[in-house]
UniProtKB/Swiss-Prot annotation:
GO terms for cellular component: chloroplast thylakoid membrane. Heme b 2 binds at H86, H187. It comes from the Eukaryota. Its main location: plastid. Keywords: Chloroplast, Electron transport, Heme, Iron, Membrane, Metal-binding, Photosynthesis, Plastid, Thylakoid, Transmembrane, Transmembrane helix, Transport. Component of the cytochrome b6-f complex, which mediates electron transfer between photosystem II (PSII) and photosystem I (PSI), cyclic electron flow around PSI, and state transitions. It comes from Jasminum nudiflorum. Heme 1 (or BH or b566) is high-potential and absorbs at about 566 nm, and heme 2 (or BL or b562) is low-potential and absorbs at about 562 nm. GO terms for biological process: photosynthesis; respiratory electron transport chain. The gene is petB. It is a multi-pass membrane protein. This is Cytochrome b6.
Amino acid sequence: MSKVYDWFEERLEIQAIADDITSKYVPPHVNIFYCLGGITLTCFLVQVATGFAMTFYYRPTVTEAFASVQYIMTEANFGWLIRSVHRWSASMMVLMMILHVFRVYLTGGFKKPRELTWVTGVVLGVLTASFGVTGYSLPRDQIGYWAVKIVTGVPEAIPVIGAPLVELLRGSASVGQSTLTRFYSLHTFVLPLLTAVFMLMHFPMIRKQGISGPL
């Protein structure tokens, strides 16, 4: 076993990386409220795992979506648990993200030199809200249908470009298969990819600049 470790150590300097991680200075004012960002990340990872599991059974069509969700909840092994954990962690992710934003704002974590960290965090907040909107429509039940109809209809009030924006969001003049396909693609591919990209920008900046000082 030591030979295997030595082989990797010689090429990757694993011990130096481990020492850097474990020896990072943590300011004495840090408390549990500074863990909210990490909890949000944990919720996101749970979302990825449970969401991936549900893609094996979910069918993104207007005729089969609701029935496939019913199948997940009643027939698939532990499907009810996986979907419930997905929903609970989604709510927890939104709550933790909001509390994290408040903590950062109240402790001045957005000030120089951490402006870019704040900007990437705001983008992650928008992506989190987008997860909620797109995911809400996927069961294709009455609540999801009307929620999507209202949300996608909001831009209609914008002069000139309102109607084209609505059609772009829905994929047609009304909420239908094109809308479900768009939202499913956004929810399962585009948004997770963008979230991962901005997280890979967000965390190294925190690592480099350290935790902001007390007020």
